[in-house]
């Protein structure tokens, strides 16, 4: 069965990084990397090259951890900063609150503490209302 385009290529969507295709050069690089076999789980030549590039730009101690999309990056970032019972204080309109589909709580096990605001910005007073029980994993 021939492959056909099933969508209107003139339509643009900016609600998510998952809406658009990749640049043709990226797709060509993926196709080239797809030829043949490589060891898996980060032991391949492409991951080694990625680490070299990151070390060059960000210093010898920098390491890259590739993830599938923005949600994966956000969950990984939060997971790296918080204990499993940790929490993030976020405005009710924050991206992490409304657009991640519960992934931080489901995957990372952290809690998103939803703070209603008039302008989408947290103030010290709003944070203080939620920031009680530090050091208590049962909070």
Predicted regions and their residues:
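Conserved PLP-anchoring active-site segment centered on the Schiff-base-forming lysine
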Residues: 80-98
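PLP-dependent aminotransferase-class I/II
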Residues: 108-139
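Conserved N-terminal alpha-helix of the aminotransferase class I/II PLP-enzyme fold
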Residues: 23-70, 92-93, 97-98, 103-105
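Conserved core of the PLP fold type I
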Residues: 62-82, 113-120
């Amino acid at each position: 069965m021939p492959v056909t385009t099933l969508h209107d290529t003139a339509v643009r969507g900016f609600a998510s990084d998952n809406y658009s295709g990749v640049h043709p050069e990226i797709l060509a690089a993926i196709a080239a990397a797809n030829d043949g076999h490589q060891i898996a789980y980060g032991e391949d030549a492409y991951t080694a090259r990625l680490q070299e590039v990151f070390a060059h730009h960000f210093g010898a101690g920098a390491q890259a951890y590739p993830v599938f999309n923005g949600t994966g990056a956000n969950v990984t970032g939060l997971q790296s900063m918080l204990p499993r019972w940790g929490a993030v204080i976020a405005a009710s309109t924050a991206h992490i609150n409304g657009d991640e589909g519960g992934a931080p709580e489901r995957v990372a096990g952290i809690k998103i503490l939803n703070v209603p605001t008039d302008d989408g910005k947290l103030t010290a007073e709003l944070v203080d209302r939620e920031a009680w029980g530090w050091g208590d994993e049962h909070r």
